[in-house]
């Protein structure tokens, strides 16, 4: 099996980003640009992944974390792409091939890279190229007019006027045979307008050495677009999100507007899922059959089962939602919550770290925290489970078939027994008996001849 090494060039300063954050750490679809490149590289199961870092390098390494499968090589001076790859030479195998990727080209797909790798072997070279209507700024692919074979790559700054008319450009992504790589890199020169060591100069060397050069192209141009400023980053963000939306629509998802939708992780959908505008999905989100997500909702690490509806302006995170539930509008479901089947959570309700059993309803203006709630419970408007004493959290247990009247407070730790009714306006501090009405109110009185205070007119 052919050994594949990967070199990722991530040492650039990114001046045009106008940011103290290294360019490769700017987020796209919820994760740093470099993470996209690393994730794609890992899909290829390479022998080694070598990251060339420079500007802000320690922060880059810290953000990526301790991955024993990554080799980090520092490029102290940014002297060009050829110089950058040369820094990785001690880490690369003597045989096999090396795939060169760029830390600021985040959206190239693994299938595109697999096709490129298939074109290469231990004694040939493969380039990823693309034809652009406006190729300005890119190196041009120079081909033999008779054989159509690649002869060289000429950078924009060094190209002749006739060469600048060529629309086929070099993306920078290439597969190189390791057996030639050291010799080629040693022969690079910086005698050009930029004074840099261009990796692309090895193409002419390969031609002179009789090495066959193959080319491959991506399915979409935006796969090979790099990020140099915030405008390009924004453009790639939308291209990525529309590509994700297209894939979901091909699976049957219905969008109110696929242009107003963001996935910052992974979204898996069942049949007949409907997603309204301005919804954001973060982490791992799974939606079952016939689920409807209304406008302006945020879902983070959520599993929602068949037939459930999330109404507008709701936020759900780290939660499991059962079948045929109703959540919102304006509901907040916080981490550690499980809603069983047919649970209703209404407007301006917050639930945290709680289990709500099937058929229960919390419809209005309530806070339920650290609670184990049984089946068929009805929580009146303005109910608060008082779970925090200033130092520790305590649990509230509400058993099956309980009715809690409006504007009630349950002071945890407490158990409201099966079938209990809590009268409206009560503050409950002790466990309640099963099947009884429990109240805690002062006696209502009316004061005759009482006059409301009035302001002086002085």
Curated annotation (Swiss-Prot):
Positions contributing to acetyl-CoA binding: 381, 387-388, 406, 424, 441
Keyword Repeat assigned: yes
Ranges where the record places region Pyrophosphorylase: 1-230
GO molecular function: glucosamine-1-phosphate N-acetyltransferase activity; magnesium ion binding; UDP-N-acetylglucosamine diphosphorylase activity
Active site (record annotation): 364 (proton acceptor)
Localisation per UniProt entry: Cytoplasm
Cited InterPro entries: Bifunctional_GlmU, GlmU-like, GlmU_C_LbH, Hexapep, MobA-like_NTP_Trfase, Nucleotide-diphossugar_trans, Trimer_LpxA-like_sf
One of the record's GO cellular component terms: membrane
Pfam families: Hexapep, NTP_transf_3
Top-level class of the enzyme under EC nomenclature: transferase
Region of interest called Linker, as start-end residue ranges on this chain: 231-251
N-acetyltransferase, as annotated region: 252-458
Catalyzed chemical reaction(s): alpha-D-glucosamine 1-phosphate + acetyl-CoA = N-acetyl-alpha-D-glucosamine 1-phosphate + CoA + H(+); N-acetyl-alpha-D-glucosamine 1-phosphate + UTP + H(+) = UDP-N-acetyl-alpha-D-glucosamine + diphosphate
Top-level taxon of the source organism: Bacteria
Annotated binding of UDP-N-acetyl-alpha-D-glucosamine, by residue: 9-12, 23, 75, 80-81, 139, 155, 170, 228, 334, 352, 367, 378
Quaternary organization: Homotrimer.
Function of the molecule: Catalyzes the last two sequential reactions in the de novo biosynthetic pathway for UDP-N-acetylglucosamine (UDP-GlcNAc). The C-terminal domain catalyzes the transfer of acetyl group from acetyl coenzyme A to glucosamine-1-phosphate (GlcN-1-P) to produce N-acetylglucosamine-1-phosphate (GlcNAc-1-P), which is converted into UDP-GlcNAc by the transfer of uridine 5-monophosphate (from uridine 5-triphosphate), a reaction catalyzed by the N-terminal domain.
UniProt protein name: Bifunctional protein GlmU
Organism this protein belongs to: Nitrosomonas eutropha (strain DSM 101675 / C91 / Nm57)
């Amino acid at each position: 099996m052919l050994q594949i090494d990967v070199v990722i060039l991530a040492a650039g300063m990114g001046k045009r980003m106008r940011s103290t954050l290294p360019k490769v750490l700017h987020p796209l679809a919820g994760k740093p640009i470099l993470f996209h490149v690393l994730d794609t590289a890992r899909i290829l199961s390479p022998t080694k992944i070598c990251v060339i870092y420079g500007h802000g390098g320690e922060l880059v390494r810290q953000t990526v974390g301790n991955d024993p499968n990554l080799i980090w090589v520092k490029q102290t001076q940014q002297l060009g792409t050829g110089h950058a790859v040369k820094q990785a030479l001690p880490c690369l195998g003597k045989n096999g091939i090396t795939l060169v990727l760029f830390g600021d080209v985040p959206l190239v797909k693994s299938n595109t890279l697999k096709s490129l790798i298939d074109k290469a072997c231990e004694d040939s070279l493969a380039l990823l190229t693309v034809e652009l209507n406006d190729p300005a700024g890119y190196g041009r692919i120079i081909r033999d007019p008779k054989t159509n074979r690649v002869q060289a790559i000429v950078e924009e700054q060094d190209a002749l006027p006739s060469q600048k008319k060529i629309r086929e450009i070099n993306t920078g992504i290439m597969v190189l045979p390791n057996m030639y790589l050291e010799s080629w890199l040693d022969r690079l020169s910086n005698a050009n307008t930029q004074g840099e060591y261009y990796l692309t100069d090895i193409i002419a060397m390969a031609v002179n050495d009789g090495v066959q050069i193959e080319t491959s192209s991506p399915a979409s141009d935006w796969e090979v677009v790099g990020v140099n400023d915030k405008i390009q980053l924004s453009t790639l963000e939308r291209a990525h999100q529309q590509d994700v939306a297209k894939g979901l629509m091909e699976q049957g998802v219905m969008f109110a507007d696929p242009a107003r939708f963001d996935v910052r992780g992974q979204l898996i959908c069942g049949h007949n899922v409907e997603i309204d505008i301005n919804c954001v999905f973060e982490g791992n989100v799974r939606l079952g059959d016939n689920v409807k997500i209304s406008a302006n909702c945020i879902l983070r690490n959520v599993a929602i089962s068949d037939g459930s509806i999330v109404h507008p302006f709701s936020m759900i995170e780290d939660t499991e939602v059962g079948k045929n539930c109703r959540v919102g509008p304006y509901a907040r479901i916080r981490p550690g919550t499980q809603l069983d089947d047919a649970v209703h959570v209404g407007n301006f309700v917050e639930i945290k770290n709680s289990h709500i059993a099937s058929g229960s309803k919390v419809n209005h203006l309530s806070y339920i925290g650290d609670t184990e709630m049984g089946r068929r419970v009805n929580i009146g408007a303005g109910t608060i489970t008082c779970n925090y004493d200033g130092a520790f959290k305590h649990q509230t247990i509400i058993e099956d078939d309980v009715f809690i009247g409006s504007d009630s407070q349950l002071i945890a730790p407490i158990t409201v027994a099966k079938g209990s009714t809590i009268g409206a306006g009560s503050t409950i501090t002790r466990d309640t008996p099963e099947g009884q009405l429990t109240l805690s109110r002062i006696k209502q009185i009316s004061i005759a001849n009482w006059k409301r205070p009035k302001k002086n007119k002085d």
